Amino acid sequence: MTFPVEKVRADFPILQREVNGLPLAYLDSAASAQKPNQVIDAESAFYRHGYAAVHRGIHTLSAQATESMENVRKQASRFINARSAEELIFVRGTTEGINLVANSWGAENIRAGDNIIISEMEHHANIVPWQMLCERKGAELRVIPLNPDGTLRLEVLATLFDDRTRLLAITHVSNVLGTENPLPEMIAQARQHGAKVLVDGAQAVMHHAVDVQALDCDFYVFSGHKLYGPTGIGILYVKEALLQEMPPWEGGGSMIATVSLAQGTTWAKAPWRFEAGTPNTGGIIGLGAAIDYVASLGLDKIGDYEQMLMHYALEQLAQVPDIRLYGPAQRLGVIAFNLGKHHAYDVGSFLDNYGIAVRTGHHCAMPLMAWYGVPAMCRASLAMYNTYEEVDRLVAGLTRIYRLLG
């Protein structure tokens, strides 16, 4: 069955606009995906007809808003096949989710002389929190190096584990290279040494189904805005046994059971003790609509279409003179490249003149840029609403830039 890309595109109003007098070719979904009408309408309807502060309210609007919010928690739980909805914490996004783990579980479990393993391809969000934690605790941060093709040197990973390894924090899919890491193999190694595993799933959940129980990871985190949902909302999954032991990171309303000036404070049960303050309820409603939307299309069908588009794009881009493509042949979502000796910003600016939106810069992955010896890369990302025609426009634009700049 052919993927209904034109029908999908019709659901995204922004794709109807022009940039610099040309139809928009939006190839930057790995930074943030566009939103379908179904998400926009769901969040708008909530604010128009159903908004109220959640929790503890006895009036109808508050009770309905609370029920809607908790239904999305259940929905997101099914989306990643968690054992229980109470293993999911609403966070602002992947970055906050990782920081929560570092400042709650990490603060309690990392000691001087321990070590944490990450990789050279990580987003800064999965580097900096662990650097900060290791500096505070006197722990060591160990790094899995890269192969030239953009995959990880797994033979080195085996040498990094020891009996003081407490955590493997690894990206599911690289936001620059598109590399999908072999999580089952890596998690199995971590288990042999008693280490916990955190997976940054920000670049994975929109491309194929994720099953956290099958993966057997301890933490899994992703953002809504890359999944065609609103900004400012994400999901942190934590295995229940770990979650019950973790102390809260932020204090305030909604995360307490009792507060006494004389006797101190007791916490609400998990996951609510990790959700201090008024939540982004509108964003949560929008996230639920986004999950519904991709589920209605079928993640397997989305993935199949995106893979066909990716193979075509890699074949066509390889024909552009003086282009350098980064990453493995088999990848998800993104294509990073440079054109000759021209700075990525210049190439991206020319493409913008042609109505083509790509991301340029270090992509919050400075260690990866350093490994490749470049200050920046261009990155085109492919989503379910992108087309073969847009790939052709990208290739034609790069060829034109080459001819103009040499």
UniProtKB/Swiss-Prot annotation:
Subcellular location: Cytoplasm
Gene3D superfamilies in UniProt: Aspartate Aminotransferase, domain 1 (3.90.1150.10), Type I PLP-dependent aspartate aminotransferase-like (Major domain) (3.40.640.10)
Pathway stated in the Swiss-Prot or TrEMBL entry: Cofactor biosynthesis; iron-sulfur cluster biosynthesis
Gene Ontology biological-process entries: cysteine metabolic process
EC number(s) stated in the UniProt entry for this protein: 2.8.1.7, 4.4.1.16
GO cellular component: cytoplasm
Keyword annotations of the record: Cytoplasm, Lyase, Pyridoxal phosphate, Transferase
Sample GO molecular function, one term: cysteine desulfurase activity
Active-site residues from the entry: C364 (cysteine persulfide intermediate)
Disulfide bonds: none
Record Pfam families: Aminotran_5
Annotated positions of the N6-(pyridoxal phosphate)lysine modification: K226
Quaternary assembly: Homodimer. Interacts with SufE and the SufBCD complex composed of SufB, SufC and SufD. The interaction with SufE is required to mediate the direct transfer of the sulfur atom from the S-sulfanylcysteine.
PANTHER family reported in the protein's UniProt record: CYSTEINE DESULFURASE (PTHR43586:SF25)
Protein name, UniProt field: Cysteine desulfurase
Organism this protein belongs to: Salmonella arizonae (strain ATCC BAA-731 / CDC346-86 / RSK2980)
Taxonomic path: Bacteria, Pseudomonadati, Pseudomonadota, Gammaproteobacteria, Enterobacterales
